[in-house]
């Protein structure tokens, strides 16, 4: 996928997640509230979680500073200052990782870490440093998977995970690693189909599914994926719901004329 397309997808995805997390950040532990507590999320997996380890006062202070750094990073990123955003995110991430390691079952902190890594990836992507973007995507992947498993009705997290998988698949496909890209697209397809099944009229859901189908059709010999991608492209081109990222591929698949 062209670099411009990747950055466009990053912009779309960041717009979906940043406001949601901005409301959760103030609820992070404070110096008088230890981060390691018994999980209260009713949607958490039923299996036994690793025992929590109490954070030290120093670690709690560092975590509180990380909340401030993350918030500053968001502000910088939203104003277009991605270099400052990266500096702030990278200052925040180590303390957030420590909190997650102290209590892996505390989903608020898992969510915080997933968002921090993802936002950092987006900032690097906006600066054209796509190798770092993909590396951060890979680092964030287990945390997004954990969130989606714990909160199966959270469509926003599910779509972000699908988008990450698609971009990682695109990177491998661009390097001619079809075998490496195929399972990433397959996982993304499952997630995207669920989102479309829940809300078939949502354009974000449809475009994520189309992206996954386009990738899957190029990474395997399964002609069903290409057939589905062609049919979906025709419908979305006709009703105008295809986004700028998918439009060139949709036009190529259907033989539709391309502008310019």
Regions found by a protein language model. Name each.
Residues 22-90:
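N-terminal leader/linker segments that initiate helical-solenoid repeat arrays
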Residues 54-60, 97-110, 145-158, 193-204, ...:
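Flexible helix-coil transition and linker loops at the boundaries of alpha-helical arrays
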Residues 215-260:
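Terminal, low-structured helical/coil segments at or just beyond the last alpha-helical repeat
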Residues 60, 67, 108, 115, ...:
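Residue register of alpha-helical TPR repeats
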Residues 79, 120, 127, 168, ...:
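Structural motif corresponding to the intra-repeat A-B loop/turn of tetratricopeptide repeats
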Residues 1-23:
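Sec-dependent N-terminal signal peptides
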Residues 67, 74, 115, 122, ...:
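Residue-level recognition of tetratricopeptide repeat
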């Amino acid at each position: 996928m062209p670099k411009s397309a990747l950055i466009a997808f990053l912009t779309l995805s960041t717009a979906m997640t940043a406001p949601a997390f901005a409301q959760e950040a103030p609820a992070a532990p404070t110096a008088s509230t230890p981060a390691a507590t018994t999980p209260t999320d009713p949607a958490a997996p039923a299996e036994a979680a690793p025992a929590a380890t109490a954070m030290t006062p120093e670690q709690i202070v560092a975590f509180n500073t990380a909340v401030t750094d993350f918030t500053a990073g968001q502000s910088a990123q939203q104003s277009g200052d991605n270099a400052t955003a990266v500096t702030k995110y990278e200052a925040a991430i180590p303390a957030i990782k420590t909190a997650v390691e102290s209590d892996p079952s505390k989903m608020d902190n898992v969510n915080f870490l997933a968002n921090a890594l993802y936002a950092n990836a987006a900032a690097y992507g906006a600066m054209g440093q796509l190798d770092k973007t993909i590396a951060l995507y890979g680092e964030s992947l287990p945390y997004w998977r954990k969130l989606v498993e714990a909160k199966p009705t959270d469509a926003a997290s599910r779509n972000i995970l699908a988008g990450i998988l698609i971009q990682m698949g695109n990177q491998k496909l661009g390097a001619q690693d079809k075998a490496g890209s195929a399972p990433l697209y397959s996982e993304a397809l499952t997630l995207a189909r669920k989102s479309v099944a829940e809300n078939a009229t949502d354009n974000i859901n449809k475009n994520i599914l189309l992206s996954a189908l386009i990738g899957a059709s190029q990474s395997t010999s399964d002609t069903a994926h290409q057939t589905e991608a062609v049919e979906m492209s025709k419908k979305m081109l006709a009703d105008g719901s295809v986004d700028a990222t998918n439009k060139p591929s949709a036009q190529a698949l259907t033989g539709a004329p391309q502008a310019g």
